C-alpha cells in the first residue's frame, strides 16, 4: 500500500498552514528532500525510528531522521547512536552520517517535524507537520514491526502504536 490514501487528507488540511509558514523562508532540508523518508513504501517498513526535527546545520539535513548526506561527518547524536550500536551489539558505525543503508533494509527514519530554519532547532514545530507525521505513524500500527522511540517527543508517539512493540530510551543528543 501507498502512503497517499493515508496522508492525502491530512496534507490537504495542513498544507495551507505549512506553506504559509515556509513562504519566503529558508528551511532545511531542501524542498526535494522534505518527504524523503516517506519514499519508502508503507508495506516495506519493518522498523520505525522517530526523530524530532531535521538537523539545523546547513548541509546536514537530508530528509531522514538522524541521517546526513554521504560524506558528512556524523553529528553528535549519531555518534552516540553508533557508540551504542557498537557497545550493545558490536556493530561499527560509518565514517559518515549517511543512514541510507538502514532505509534500504526497511528502517523508516521519520522526524516528527519535517523542516527547520537553519540554525534554529525546533523552529517549525506546530505549523502542521506533527499532524502529517502522526497520520503516517498511525498507519504503521501493525505487525511485524517495531518502533524505536528516543526521547520525550518520540515517546509521545507510542500512543499511536498500540499494537507495535516499542523500545524507549533517552534521546541520543549529548545536549
Please place each PLM-identified region on the residue numbering.
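A polyanion-binding, active-site-adjacent surface
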Residues: 2-161, 165-175
